[in-house]
């Protein structure tokens, strides 16, 4: 399964990013969507979409966290990164910092795709691809935009 992971779009989703993620099996947005037109554009792809609410979002229909199992991995989506992963989490995905992250903090791996529109600390604008195959190590790849 190939997942496009984006975060912190802050009212903007560049057309080249939208075109790139059309090959995904799922899209995960890790918060700070800021404009429901972004959600509409993502839904228009007809690719399954998971969104969590960020600190700049006001849509009460978006959950603060999502927990689910996919391809045998226990996954936690959240906007603001916790210090420690919740129990029974293999992979934790967050936004908020606008800086890419790929870090093992036993027992979980923490991932941040960076920010498409307003990256911080000299990081280039980015989103990420996650490839999950049951029984194999997850593959995390940043794509710079």
Positions of predicted regions on the chain:
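Active-site neighborhood of phospho(di)ester-bond hydrolases with catalytic His/Asp-centered motifs
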Residues: 5-7, 26-32, 50-55, 76-79, ...
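Short, glycine/serine-rich, charged loops/turns that create anion-binding
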Residues: 10, 34, 56, 98, ...
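Binuclear metal-dependent phosphoesterase catalytic core
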Residues: 15, 69-71, 104-105, 110-145
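Short, flexible, glycine/charge-rich loop motifs used to bind or transfer phosphoryl groups or to couple energy/partner
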Residues: 15-20, 38-40, 65-66, 79-85, ...
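Helix-adjacent hinge/juxtasegments
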Residues: 48-87
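Non-DNA-binding regulatory cores of transcription-related proteins
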Residues: 87-105
């Amino acid at each position: 399964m190939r997942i496009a992971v984006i975060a912190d779009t802050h009212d903007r989703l560049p057309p080249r990013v939208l075109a790139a993620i059309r090959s995904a099996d799922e899209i995960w947005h890790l918060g700070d969507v800021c404009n429901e037109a972004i959600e509409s554009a993502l839904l228009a792809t007809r690719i399954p979409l998971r969104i969590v609410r960020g600190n700049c979002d006001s849509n009460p229909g978006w959950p603060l966290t999502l927990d689910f199992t996919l391809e045998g991995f226990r996954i936690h989506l959240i906007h603001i990164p916790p210090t420690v992963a919740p129990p029974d989490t293999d992979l934790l995905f967050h936004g908020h910092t606008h800086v890419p992250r790929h870090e093992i903090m036993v027992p979980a791996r923490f991932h941040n795709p960076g920010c498409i529109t307003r990256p911080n600390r000299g990081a280039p604008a980015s989103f990420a691809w996650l490839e999950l195959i049951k029984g194999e190590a997850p593959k995390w790849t940043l794509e710079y935009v």
